[in-house]
């Protein structure tokens, strides 16, 4: 099949040889893909590397359905440029965390237009966010991603004083008897608060750093139980120091 235009979200760039790096990206047309990009010192190679920073949104040309195991990426163009992310160290750190998380979650994924549109919209929101919106973005993103992935907790079950059952993804009036994967009442209350967060209202939530980090840990553990293990994310510790 001839090369054609594809729409990409850059996730991870790894050096493959002195001449090539491998870009892992999530595409509208083919799901998760690996693409070869040049590693030279020339302007074209430098520009391509700059355009493939974590969470960059691109259009490019590649033969993702051909016989080549790792097809080359050609003619990448930002769509749109992420000026806010590129100018903010905090947003860059969040982008690194989200990109690493997605490279694990979407590793074997097939094309999913709804997921791709959600990711593009979320990245554009991060690009324009400020203040408390930026600090709360990882929580808002993770919770709303759970909805896209089909593992969103049932927040309609929350009652004051209830406990959150991590296995079943709902709040209970009493602790489950068959396992110990549940939260105490205070953490269950925080979990219920997080369940109300959206990309539109995330700036209204006034979490302390300790609450934010604990909520982040619990959400990653929830994903690990219901989707895929997220216990070894290298960017997590650095993210904690930022938010």
Stretch-by-stretch model annotation:
Residues 1-22, 26-243:
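Non-catalytic alpha-helical scaffolds and adjoining flexible linkers that form interface surfaces
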């Amino acid at each position: 099949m001839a090369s054609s235009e594809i729409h990409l979200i850059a996730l991870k760039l790894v050096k493959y040889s002195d001449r090539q790096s491998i870009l892992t990206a999530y595409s509208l047309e083919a799901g998760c893909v690996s693409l070869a990009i040049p590693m030279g010192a020339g302007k074209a190679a430098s520009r391509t590397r700059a355009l493939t920073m974590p969470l960059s949104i691109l259009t490019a040309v590649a033969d993702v359905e051909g016989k080549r195991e790792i097809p080359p990426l050609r003619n990448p163009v930002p769509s749109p440029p992420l000026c806010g992310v590129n100018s903010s160290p905090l947003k860059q750190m969040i982008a690194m965390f989200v990109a690493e998380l997605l490279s694990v979650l979407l590793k074997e994924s097939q094309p999913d237009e709804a997921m791709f549109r959600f990711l593009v919209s979320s990245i554009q929101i991060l690009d324009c966010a400020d203040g408390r919106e930026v600090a709360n973005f990882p929580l808002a993103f993770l919770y709303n991603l759970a909805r896209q992935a089909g593992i969103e907790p049932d927040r309609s079950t929350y009652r004051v004083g209830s406990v959150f059952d991590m296995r079943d993804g709902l709040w209970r009036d009493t602790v489950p008897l068959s396992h110990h994967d549940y939260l105490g009442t205070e953490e269950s209350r925080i979990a219920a608060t997080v369940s109300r967060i959206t990309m539109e209202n995330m700036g209204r939530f006034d979490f302390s750093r300790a609450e934010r980090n604990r909520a982040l840990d619990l959400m990653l553990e929830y994903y690990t139980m219901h989707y895929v293990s997220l216990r070894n994310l290298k960017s997590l510790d650095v993210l904690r120091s930022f938010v």
